[in-house]
Structures are given as C-alpha cells and as structure tokens.
Regions:
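Acidic, mature catalytic/reactive cores of soluble proteins
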Residues: 1-187
Length: 187
C-alpha cells in the first residue's frame, strides 16, 4: 500500500485538515485512524489518570471529545462514511527527543478514545478534520481545496519572504501585531 498524507491548518480557524490519498494497493484496503489526545496547555505533559473522560459523543461524520472540564470540545470528522469504534485506552511514554535535548521533560501518556475506520480504493482521497467547532462533513473537500488555492505559490525568493512574513502578523479585531517568538506566546 502507498498512502499519501497532506496536512493543512485552515487560515483563521482552529481546524486541521488531513487528506489521505491511496496511491497504490494490491488488495481491498481499509483506512484506520486512531487519534491520540492530550488536552493540556502547550507547556505541560499529559500522564495517565482516572479523571479523563474517555467517552466519545456522535456528531455527523464523526465524534466529539472533551477529556476535561474547562477545555473546548474537539470535533473529529471525516468527509466519507466511516465507523467510529469506541475503544478508550491510555498509551504510555511517548518520547519527545527534541524536548529532552533542550533539557525539558519529554515523556507523555496519551489517551485514545477509539478509532475511525473506512474503506478506501486506489485513487480515492479521504479528509479527516480536527476542530474546536463542529463542521459540515460535506464541505471538507471544498475547504481543503480553497485553503490550497489561498496559499501563495512559493516559487521565488520574494514570494517565500512574503509568505514567511505573513505568518508573524496577528490580527485581533481592529488590532494588528507583529509577533516575536511565535507561536510560543499564545497569539
């Protein structure tokens, strides 16, 4: 099996789209996606505990989860018919070598609430969405293509420079800022 994976953060939204395309397969193929969840701030690490809510709640095209009160819901949806198999379980000791090299703690436990399963055929693309808002699964392919089109071509030095500079401009209402240290300051 040869599978292509493309990730896109959607501009001005808290949404990640992941497109999987089956480029080659010699037999019937099933795609199984098992999201690992942390629900923590960017400086903390998650450890297995009895307080995490491992339940998943059905929404169109997927499920929503919130491991702890006070966090937003995480909506995970697919643009194709799929089955979500609830199977909550902790996975232990994920290692972040870069963090350890920097002198920070670098081991984390992550909870999975289950997995998505769908059939996929050669040449087919499937889009998986993670967002703090529920979306219409029927629009995921359009959203992916629009985000691709919105991005500038980075074919020469000047267009690369413009693209890089835009990543450090943050707008909050009518206020515009240039951020130093992005994204570590939460802007």
């Amino acid at each position: 099996v040869v599978l292509k994976k493309e990730l896109l953060w959607i501009h001005s939204r808290t949404q990640l789209l992941i497109r999987y395309t089956l480029l080659d397969a010699r037999s019937d193929t099933q795609l199984r996606l098992r999201p690992f969840l942390a629900f923590r701030d960017r400086h903390g690490l998650s450890k297995a505990n009895l307080f995490a809510d491992g339940r998943s709640y059905p929404i169109p095209g997927g499920v929503r989860n919130r491991l702890y009160e006070g966090f937003p819901w995480l909506h995970m949806q697919m643009n194709v018919p799929c089955e979500f198999v609830a199977a909550p379980d902790w996975y232990y000791n994920f290692e972040y070598a870069e963090e350890i090299d920097r002198g920070y703690p670098g081991h984390e436990d992550l909870l999975t609430t289950g997995y998505f399963e769908t059939d996929i055929v050669k040449g087919q693309s499937v889009i998986f969405s993670c967002s703090t808002e529920e979306v219409d699964p029927a629009t995921l392919e359009k959203d992916f293509m629009e985000e691709l089109a919105r991005r500038s071509n980075k074919i020469d030095f000047l267009s690369c420079l413009r693209h890089s500079a835009r990543q450090f401009i943050v707008r909050h209402g009518d206020k515009t800022e240039v951020v130093a240290g992005y994204p570590w300051f939460g802007r």
